[in-house]
Amino acid sequence: MNTKNLTLQTYFPTLIGVITNPDHQTLENKLTKKCLKLRKKIKSGGENWISNETYNTLGTYHLSEDPDFSNINDFVTNQVIHYCKAQSIDLNCLDTDPLAWLSLYKKNNYQEWHAHTPAMISAAYYLRCNDSSAKIYFKNPVDTMLPPKVLSYNNLNFEQVEFQPKPGMLLIFKSHLYHCVAQQQNNDIRICLSYNYRRKD
C-alpha cells in the first residue's frame, strides 16, 4: 500500500487565539487593587455555579462599563476583531459591547466544566496570576463514541488542551467550547477577566 502521497487536510478546526498584552505591567497593580475592593462591596454572581465559593461578578458588576478597565477592555475587543477577521467572520454581526466580569480565585477555588453559549465569541484575560496558578482546560468539541487507542497526543488528536495562565495573557475562543479551571493550589490570588461577545440581531 503506497502512502507516500497521503496528505492530511485540516477542516473544522478549533481555534484558540493567544496573545500577551505588552502594556500589562502598567495596569496589573492598580486593577488588582480595584478587583479586591470590588470583592468587598459587590455581591458575588454566577447564579447556579457548582463552584459557588469562587468570587465573581457575573450579573452583579459589568467591567465593560467601568472606565478603570477601559485599556484592557479595548485591547481584548481589538484582538477579538483580529480573531474574527482571520476566520472571515462578518464583523457587522459582532456586538463589540461585551458582557464582562471578573473571577477571583483563592486557594481551593475552581470552576467546573462549562460553555458560554448563547454568546458567539468569548475571551479570558489574566490580570493576576503566577507560574503555579490554576490552569484552564479546553475540551475537544467532537465527542467520539468509540475513540481509538492513541499512542501519543498532538494537535490532531488532543482530547483536551491546557494553558498555564501568565499575567497579561489573553485567550479567545468560540463560546460553545467547553472549558474549566483546575483547583487553585497556592495561597496567591488568581484574577481572570472574562468576556462574552454576542451576535447582533
Where are the model-predicted features located?
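A general secondary-structure signal for short beta-strands and their flanking turns/coil
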Residues: F12-T14, P118-M120, D188-R190
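Solvent-exposed residues in well-ordered beta-strands and their adjoining turns
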Residues: T20-P22, Y105, Y126-R128, N196-K200
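Hydrophobic residues positioned within well-ordered beta-strands of beta-sheet architectures
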Residues: G17, P98-A100, I121-A123, I191-Y195
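Catalytic core of non-heme Fe(II) oxygenases with the double-stranded beta-helix
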Residues: L102-I172
